[in-house]
């Protein structure tokens, strides 16, 4: 079967309507911030335990030291809580700048420390912050789809994740989540049921260093997204449903 080079999403990817680059910076890992992140992880684990029946596969694949780019599919609002609850460290989070307009999220993000990004725009400050994080040996988590899926399955990837991995020469760690749709979890909670959720950590891989130019970047993005698709059940593969066929 022929493989499409650039799968398309059902609707155009969002572009940030605001431009506040002064807010984009790499969080400083002070002692107090490390403590806040630890407390936040404990809180996330409590929420996950109460609201879901989470099954975790492949945690041994997660790198314990050294820089890495963690890529996840994005089904719903609970994804960040689930990922931060199960991962053994406190990765840097790349988040859309619009989240700062929600007071509660702004408070949490400022305490944890988030690298803000302006989607659909050449955000050099976000790139610089991410590359500095890698130089310091930190791990970064990002959703390469660029938004929460509007179809309930994998959408086409944007090139940001591939660019960062290639630029920094760091491994990509694929993490997939199923069952985290907000509506599904909300409906089960109303019935006093915990929602079954599955997370899978795949083996880290290095993108081809020969990838150059826009075509090479798109190819690297395709590799990332197809790797995520192969970790997902067929119903969640979306525009990458052709993999393994």
What is the meaning of each model-derived region?
Residues 51-53, 90, 111, 137, ...:
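A generic structural signal for alpha->beta connector loops
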Residues 56, 93, 114-116, 172, ...:
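Conserved beta-strand scaffold positions in the cores of enzyme catalytic domains, especially
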Residues 43-74:
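Helix-to-loop junction immediately C-terminal to a conserved catalytic motif
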Residues 35, 39, 43, 79-82, ...:
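Hydrophobic alpha-helical segments typical of transmembrane helices
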Residues 30-52, 106, 110-113:
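Short hydrophobic helices that act as membrane-entry/anchoring signals
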Residues 62-122, 129:
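Catalytic core of membrane glycerolipid acyltransferases/transacylases, capturing the structured
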Residues 2-36, 125-245:
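Non-catalytic C-terminal accessory region of glycerolipid acyltransferases
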Residues 52, 120-123, 154:
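A conditional alpha-helix N-cap/helix-loop micro-motif detector
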């Amino acid at each position: 079967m022929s493989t499409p080079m650039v799968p398309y999403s059902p609707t155009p990817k969002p572009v940030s309507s605001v431009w506040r680059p002064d807010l984009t910076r790499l969080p400083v890992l002070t002692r107090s911030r490390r403590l806040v992140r630890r407390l936040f992880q404990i809180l996330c684990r409590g929420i996950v335990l109460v609201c879901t029946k989470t099954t975790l596969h492949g945690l041994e694949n997660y790198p314990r030291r050294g820089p890495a780019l963690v890529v996840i599919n994005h089904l719903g609002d609970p994804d960040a809580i689930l990922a931060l609850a199960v991962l053994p460290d406190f990765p840097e989070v790349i988040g859309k700048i619009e989240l700062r307009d929600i007071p509660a999220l702004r408070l949490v993000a400022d305490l944890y420390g988030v690298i803000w990004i302006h989607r659909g725009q050449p955000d050099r400050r976000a790139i610089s912050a991410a590359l500095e994080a890698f130089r310091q040996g930190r791990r970064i988590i990002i959703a390469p789809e660029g938004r929460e899926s509007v179809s309930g399955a994998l959408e086409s990837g944007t090139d940001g994740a591939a660019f960062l991995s290639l630029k920094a020469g760091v491994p990509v760690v694929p993490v997939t989540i199923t069952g985290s749709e907000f509506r599904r979890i909300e409906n089960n909670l109303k019935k006093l049921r915990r929602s079954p959720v599955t997370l899978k950590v795949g083996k880290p891989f290095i993108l081809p260093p020969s990838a150059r130019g826009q075509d090479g970047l798109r190819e690297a993005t395709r590799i990332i997204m197809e790797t995520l698709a192969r970790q997902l059940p067929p119903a969640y593969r979306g525009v990458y449903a052709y993999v393994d066929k």
